[in-house]
Amino acid sequence: MKVRSSVKKICEKCKIVRRGGRVFVICENPRHKQKQG
């Protein structure tokens, strides 16, 4: 899980999701998981 100020899709399978006022990126590739913090 990477914590970044700006989250971006890295590949086509990345999805941007909002949970509890936070922005996450979920992907099949665990290295692409990101959180906005």
UniProtKB/Swiss-Prot annotation:
Tell whether Ribosomal protein is among the UniProt keywords.
yes
Any one biological process term the GO annotation gives: translation
- Which PROSITE patterns does the record associate with it? RIBOSOMAL_L36 (PS00828)
Q: Name one GO cellular component term.
A: ribonucleoprotein complex
State if Ribosomal protein is listed as a keyword: yes
NCBIfam families, A to Z? rpmJ_bact
Query: What family does the Swiss-Prot or TrEMBL record give for this protein?
Result: Belongs to the bacterial ribosomal protein bL36 family.
- In Swiss-Prot or TrEMBL terms, this protein is called Large ribosomal subunit protein bL36
The primary gene name is rpmJ
